[in-house]
Amino acid sequence: TPLVQMGPNDWLLELFHGPTLAFKDVAMQMLSRLMDHVLRERGERLTIVGATSGDTGGAALEAFKNCNGIDTFFMFSNGKVSDFQRRQMTTIGAENCHAIAIDGSFDDCQSMVKDMFGHQSFANKIRLSAVNSINWGRVMAQVVYYFTAAAALGAPEQRVSFTVPTGNFGDIYAGFVAKQMGLPISRLVIATNENDILARTLTTGDHRLESVKPTITPSMDIQISSNFERLLFEAAGQDSTIVRDLMAALKNNHNYSLPDKMLTFIRDSFDAGVVSEIETLEEVALILRNTGYLTDPHTAIAVKVAREHADPDVPMVTLSTAHPAKFPDTVHDATGKTSHPPVWGDIPAERSETVAHLMNDRACVEAHILEHFFRAQKLINSTAKD
């Protein structure tokens, strides 16, 4: 995770040097090995089911493809991820890895995953587990690069700020955990696109769901950020009753209002900025023109927001969460340049895709998962007899 200097007290933290060219690799590669080791020791199997707005699915399927005791299923919104992101999921070619295209939004996919955990008979039968950022292991691994980046820039004597492209709130929440652990973080800045529920919440205290707007930064096309609930728990003084009531209001009324004390707690650590679609394209071009550096659109949003929240006395680190080659059409539209993936992240054009297209219906998805589960069990039993 190298730091690249863009200007005075202006840094990028490159998190895209893993096998799928996204920051999700940092945690996923560790988590897959830990889970596989424990399951082998116990002689057990698990089924992972997850939802992805783009990068998590590819990173998870890549990380778990050699874990024979773990069957991995990932849902994504059909047509709402880039071609490169889709092919990362659909060309894995491993018997235990499955990509599912859903006719619905990412929030629909994520809600189905949560509901599956509440469907006890299903969850128990397949031994359901998760590796989305609701998995604490993911957050824990991401805390590390906040410490390494800050230490490289002079911490603990020097305070450091971070700006993070934010969708599901897991990456920036890891920064909050680092701050709670004692890392001298001045500000944590949420950078988002026009799906700006987190920025609106920070400004007004009103957390109100709106329709998801499809954009050129699909990893931010989210209205329900799972890890924001973790921050609410801290803001509520770890009172789970308060958080439960807020979540119930969100589910039933599609909004809640934060008490002043909780809002003040959040504002003590966080700022936020919103960047439009046009501004994103302009920023990708501006960064290239000024520095010769090509960014993906999510990183470009964060760079613009970081500039708007810069303090000349405090280093600002912008998290660069994906390689620009993951979004070639957007990068080309903005700059006229073609970004090619490094050799280790390239996907041969002739590699075939395998994907299940399913309705936005939990029962339908569960039936699909069970079909594969029973088929795998039958194969295991047959092998054991031999």
Question: At which residue positions do the language-model features occur?
Answer:
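PLP-dependent amino-acid enzyme catalytic core
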Residues: T1-D386
